Regions:
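Donor-nucleotide binding loops and adjacent catalytic segments primarily
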Residues: 422, 440-539, 590
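Short beta-strand/loop motif that positions the catalytic acidic residue
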Residues: 159, 165-167
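Conserved alpha/beta-hydrolase catalytic His-Asp/Glu region
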Residues: 88-150, 155
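Catalytic active-site module of serine/aspartate enzymes centered on a nucleophile-bearing elbow/loop
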Residues: 187-227
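Conserved nucleotide-sugar phosphate-binding/catalytic loop shared by glycosyltransferases and other
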Residues: 260, 264-315
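Active-site loop/oxyanion-hole signature of alpha/beta-hydrolase fold enzymes
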Residues: 1-41, 210
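A nucleotide-sugar donor-handling region in carbohydrate enzymes
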Residues: 373-377, 381-477, 507-509
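Flexible "cap/lid" loop of the alpha/beta hydrolase fold
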Residues: 51, 59-96, 561
Length: 630
């Protein structure tokens, strides 16, 4: 068991009571011994707990608030209880300022906790948590008696268990000298992190996780080893689980890659709903996939009625991405691969650039969009945040160009939006041309195979006299509101189009049984080869995901697409690309009443279209680029 010792709800108390509480918890949970981890002032509680030698197996102290290591210079220039003429910098660490401007103090304090560039997310989180209490309550916590230096040193010298001290050298809250002193006084191991601030477990979590693991439970050496020349040629493929579009194109790329390297074995690190596509294609899903935290569930939890703030949802997925990177780390540590392929595998790309020493194989990055873009109603703050994320990515690539051995854009340069990454940042199209190879779009099929519409309709079960409308929202569970809106429109559309047959495809994460029944309307779940049904339809109503829209564009079918509100990729990147092809008709969900949808279906069904042709060799081109690394 690992017990984390940290600050509790504020009250007038000594650290001893916190340590006693921890012992009581161990007793209640029948935990004989524990490894304790203390952060900042929680280290003082940890020292008290470590005095119970029979209960503490080992202790880890991160950025310790350890009085035995001297004072923190920048924090002793002002007295906490004095009224001051002005409150700038550390003068804000003051009772009167806390009572006057609690938010102002939090914003300053956490800007000092997270001194690392591009720390907007943890600062935002911590300020939000801090606002759950008040300046008055915070001031009360400061009245508790402080641990004195000699008392702290005495406790440290009594510690008999193994100790690891982790401290950022740039810590602006607790000087690194305190961590150095604590390691010396406990006889513990000291790890100093250059450039890290007060919370390295937040800003350098991979490094801290690995330090914890090596200290607590070092990995045993592998029992078997194979000489390089006797190893099978292997690739690890990570496909984005947000929707199903990535999975379909990735299977097509994998098929082409095997044609170029017939001896190549491909393992997939994947989660639902991607696993449904992989299972249908008889691909090998690595058993480690069972340990992945599900990203689609998070995305669904972030959505409202046809509304998904995609940028913020991914920002708030940070703990999931970290957990999944650690799964990947353990997998590639134990099993050698000749190649890693990540199709919008954000966890892999971000944490590799943050920890380039963890790269163990050539790595290919695939994406169909470049650049986070702000939604108009997000104002200046959202524009600042997206620019900050873009700047971090640009800096990653500039500092560590060797991390991505290939960066492949799934499309052409004209598909890239003309916007800039942000103020004083380059144009997205210009930067992408310099840093990516272009493979063309990957459909996973040849549109020429569907030239005989009559035969195709017969194969998928549609009769010649029917006017077939397919309604689908991809592989996530976010699109349920659009499906229900279209189902509401069906009776009126059917009245206007007597031959109408509507097929609502819910995908693997929406229950088909939750929809109303009508004659001429059928509701189906996951369809493995949905693109064939789309190619055979007379009209499709879809959400706005790139894959489905491009499948319809490639097969020249008329379609209505309804982008999710606040989904920057669907509203900007996908819409721009479809405009290049002259494809689809965009419909605003706010205006898409059942009557409006019925009217649009009546206008669009069976309409002849003249889209720009979509290339059919994208998968081959992509595989050829990847094969260069094998």
């Amino acid at each position: 068991m690992v017990a984390q010792i940290g600050p509790r709800k504020p009250r007038h108390t000594r650290s001893a009571s916190n340590a006693a509480d921890a012992v009581a918890i161990m007793d209640a949970t029948h935990t004989e011994r524990a490894i304790i981890i203390g952060f900042s002032r929680g280290v003082q509680r940890g020292l008290l707990l470590a005095a119970h030698q029979e209960r503490v197996q080992a202790a880890v102290f991160i950025a310790p608030s350890y009085p035995g290591g001297g004072k923190v210079p920048q924090r002793i220039a002002f007295e906490w209880g004095d009224e001051l003429d002005s409150y700038e910098g550390w003068a804000k660490y003051n009772k009167h300022y806390w009572l006057r401007d609690h938010r102002g103090f939090l914003e300053f304090f956490f800007s000092q906790v997270f001194i690392e560039p591009h720390s907007t997310k943890p600062i935002e989180d911590c300020v939000g948590w801090g606002l759950e209490t008040t300046g008055e309550t915070l001031a009360l916590t400061h009245l508790a008696p402080e641990m004195q230096p000699e008392e702290a040193r005495e406790m440290a010298r009594r510690v008999r268990c193994p100790v690891l001290v982790i401290h950022g050298e740039a810590d602006a809250i607790q000087s690194a000298s305190r961590g150095i002193a604590l390691a010396e006084h406990t006889g513990g191991q000291l790890i100093l992190l250059d450039g890290s601030g007060h919370a390295p477990h937040v800003r350098d979590p991979v490094r801290v996780n690995l330090l914890l693991r090596d200290f607590i439970k070092p990995a045993p050496p592998p029992r078997r080893w194979a000489r390089g020349r006797s190893r099978r040629k292997r690739a690890l493929y990570i496909s984005s689980p947000i929707g199903l579009g990535h999975a379909r194109r990735d299977v097509a790329i994998a098929d082409e890659l095997r044609k170029l390297h017939p001896d190549l074995e491909i393992d997939w690190l994947a989660q639902h709903p991607v696993t449904r596509v992989l299972q249908a294609a008889s691909e090998r899903i690595h058993p480690a996939s069972a340990y992945l935290a599900n990203e689609s569930s998070h995305i669904e939890s972030e959505s409202a009625e046809h509304d998904l703030h995609c940028f913020q949802a991914i920002r708030r997925m940070d703990e999931i991405l970290l957990a999944n990177f650690m799964v990947l780390h353990d997998l590639v540590r134990d099993e050698p691969y000749d190649l890693w392929i990540g199709d919008e595998a954000w966890e892999l790309d971000y944490y590799l650039h943050e920890n380039p020493e963890q790269k163990r194989a050539p790595y290919v990055w695939l994406t169909d969009f470049v650049g986070w873009l702000p939604m108009p109603d997000g104002g200046d703050h959202e524009a600042f945040l997206t620019a900050d994320y873009n700047a971090e990515m640009i800096e990653h690539i500039a500092r560590f160009p060797r991390v991505r051995d290939h960066a492949i854009f799934v499309g052409n340069d004209s598909d890239i939006v003309p916007d800039a990454f942000g103020p004083e940042l380059p144009l997205i199209r210009d930067w992408t041309r310099e840093h990516y190879s272009f493979a063309g779009y990957v459909t996973g099929f040849d549109p020429a195979d569907f030239a005989d519409q009559g035969r195709l309709r017969h194969e998928v079960g549609y009769r010649d006299h029917e006017q077939v409308c397919i309604v689908t929202v991809g592989g996530s569970g976010v699109g349920g509101h659009l499906l229900r809106r279209v189902v509401e429109a069906f009776p009126e559309a059917k009245r206007r189009i007597p031959a109408l047959r509507m097929v609502v495809v819910t995908g693997p994460r929406i229950d088909p049984g939750t929809f109303a029944e009508h004659e001429g309307l059928e509701v189906r779940g996951f369809i493995p080869e949905l693109y064939r049904h789309l190619a055979a339809c007379d009209l499709a109503v879809v959400q706005g995901g790139l894959t489905t829209c491009m499948e319809l564009t490639a097969t020249r079918r008329p379609f209505l697409y309804v982008p999710l509100r606040h989904h920057f990729e669907q509203n900007f990147h996908v819409r721009h690309r479809l405009d290049q092809y002259g494809a689809g008709r965009m419909l605003d969900f706010d205006l898409a009443t059942p009557d409006a949808i019925a009217n649009m279906i009546t206008q669009e069904i069976g309409r002849s279209v003249d889209y720009k042709a979509v290339e059919s060799d994208g998968a081959t081109n992509t595989a050829t680029l990847i094969a260069e690394l094998l």
